[in-house]
Every structure is written in C-alpha cells, then in structure tokens.
Amino acid sequence: MDTFSTKSLALQAQKKLLSKMASRAVASAFIDDTSSEVLDELYRATKEFTRSRKEAQKLVKNLVKVAVKLGVLLRAGQLGAEELARLQRLRQQARRLAMTAVSFHQVDFTFDRRVLATTLLECRDLLHQAAGAHLTAKSHGRINHVFGHLADCDFLAALYSPAEPYRSHLRRICDGLTRMLDEDSI
C-alpha cells in the first residue's frame, strides 16, 4: 500500500519552512506584541543567568519553533479530539501557571520554586501528549530543552531574587503575563 500524501507532504514542508524562519528577529510575525515583549525579557533573563547569548537565543528560538509548529498543526486540522482536549488542559494549566507566577511576584515571601517547577513540567508533559506523533523527536527535544530550563529551580530562584537585573526582568515578564491574562491570550 502506497502511503504517499500530497497534503502530508505540504504540511511537512510548511512546518520545515516555518521552523527555519523561527528566530527572535521574525518572532513578531507569528506572535503578538505582548508575547514578543515577554519572550524578549525571558531572553534577557536567560542570557544573564547562563552568561551565554547563544544559549538564550537557542531557548527562545526553540520556544518559537514549537509554538509555530503547533499553530500549523492546529490550522491544518491535524489534531484529533483527544489531542485538542489535551491542548485545552494545557491552556488552562498555562493560565494557572501565569497567575501563580504573577502572584508570587506581587506578594512578597510567597515564592515557591517547587510549585512553579512542578507546574512547568506538567505543562511540558501535556504538550508532549497533545503533539505526540505529529512532532519529530527533535521537536520533542526542543520542548524538553525549553521546559527544562524554565523549570530549573536555580533559574527560578535567580529570577525571583530581589537582586537586579533579575527583579527588573521579572517585573516586565509579569507585566506582560498580566496583559496576556487580561486579553485572554494565554
């Protein structure tokens, strides 16, 4: 039986093309201004924490690539009902995560890195389950890289520390998350 499909080939080409274009410079073409500001601030905080411009760029690039590929899958109607339900659970979990992150920033002495790390890893698992067979092993590796960094307790502790420049990065990230929550875009 011949399994060739033009539709499948076109979808693969579209994902490949978009993944090649996904960089910080063109991210604004695929995401709104607020999301772009949050990603820029995440880039700066990561660059400060890792002391590596290359690592910070890789993190944001991987995040954008996965988001773009997921958007392509959604637009092409490639996800089944169960996968869409998992994505809905992921969206709800991401909203709770954003509200928790903002709350930890706004209320002194409430920060608990384990809560954020656990929730981030739950989001990672939901994303793996939802995207499943539609993404390559390399894309799943990108998901692991992004969430592994974000859930790193040392990174979270640095980000929520009262020291500069992390305090400024966190304030701008939380300002963006608050706008995204208000606009219901997360």
From Swiss-Prot:
Pfam families: DUF758
Compartment(s): Cytoplasm
Keywords in alphabetical order: Cytoplasm
InterPro entries per record: TNFAIP8-like, TNFAIP8_sf
Domain of life assignment: Eukaryota
Gene Ontology CC terms, in alphabetical order: cytoplasm
GO biological process: negative regulation of TOR signaling; regulation of apoptotic process
Subunit-structure text: Interacts with FBXW5; TNFAIP8L1 competes with TSC2 to bind FBXW5 increasing TSC2 stability by preventing its ubiquitination.
Assigned protein family: Belongs to the TNFAIP8 family.
Function: Acts as a negative regulator of mTOR activity.
Name of the protein in question: Tumor necrosis factor alpha-induced protein 8-like protein 1
Annotated organism of origin: Bos taurus
Gene: TNFAIP8L1
